[in-house]
Design a protein with these regions (language model features):
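Sec-dependent bacterial lipoprotein signal peptides
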Residues: 1-20
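Generic low-complexity segments that are intrinsically disordered, proline-rich and/or Lys/Arg-biased
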Residues: 5, 13, 59-62, 127, ...
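Generic N-terminal simple sequence motifs
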Residues: 8, 21, 87, 172-173
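Positively charged, low-complexity intrinsically disordered regions
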Residues: 9-10, 56, 102, 144, ...
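Immediate post-signal-peptide N-terminus of mature secreted/exported proteins
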Residues: 22-75, 182-186
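Long, amphipathic, charge-rich alpha-helical segments that form helical bundles/coiled-coils
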Residues: 37-43, 67-70, 74-157
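Juxtamembrane amphipathic/coiled-coil helical coupling segments that flank
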Residues: 156-171, 178
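Short, low-complexity, Pro/Ser/Thr/Gly-rich segments in the mature regions of secreted, periplasmic
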Residues: 173-190
Length: 190
């Protein structure tokens, strides 16, 4: 047997061996993204609890800090998802994660706007008299935008679950939920 024939016969077996030993890139990507989303879902739950306490007794430093923390949380999550290698990953999975990142980038921008607004209130000035209740009213005006982002995120959750079922069947293994689990915000938005 000459070298080219040997390589032609061995190459498929070598590729199969590497795939088994290294794991499927889609499964690896999926699990890493799911781990990131689980971690940041838990962090967002803690942040929402803090915001609920602030809603009952608003303080400008607390509002500014919470909006900064929300923006930081979403930024860190986005950076971690962006750092994942997409080489040889199923395009449907990477497309979902990209759409998810774009949606939550809007949430991050909103949190950054609130942070800047509260910073101005903290500094005071002719246009910004430090008044927590007025600052909270400003949040109220953004509720509609928050609700719109959340509605789109819920639709994205449904798509993620359908994608999870499809890929689990295709790959013949159970995959963890991929989506960023949204905290319950009804009390916060009422």
């Amino acid at each position: 047997m000459n070298a080219p024939v040997f390589l032609r016969r061995m190459l498929p077996m070598l590729a199969a061996f590497l795939m088994v030993s290294c794991g499927d890139p889609t499964v690896s990507y999926w699990k890493k993204a799911a781990d990131i989303n689980t971690e940041y879902s838990e962090k967002s739950d803690v942040l929402v609890q803090r915001l609920l306490k602030l809603k009952k007794n608003p303080t400008l430093p607390g509002l500014e800090e919470s909006s900064r923390d929300a923006a930081d949380l979403l930024r860190e999550r986005d950076e971690e998802l962006a750092d994942l290698s997409t080489k040889n990953v199923d395009p449907a999975v990477t497309a979902y994660v990209e759409e998810d990142r774009k949606l939550f980038a809007r949430g991050m921008e909103l949190a950054e706007r609130y942070q800047q607004y509260f910073e101005k209130y903290l500094k005071g000035g002719p246009d910004f008299t430090p008044d927590p209740s007025r600052a909270v009213a400003h949040i109220g005006r953004g509720r509609q935008e928050i609700r719109k982002i959340l509605a789109e995120a819920r639709k994205l959750e449904e798509r993620a679950e359908m994608l999870r079922k499809e890929k689990s069947a295709e790959l013949e293994q159970e995959l963890p939920p991929l989506h960023f689990r949204l905290p319950e915000l009804k009390q916060l938005l009422s």
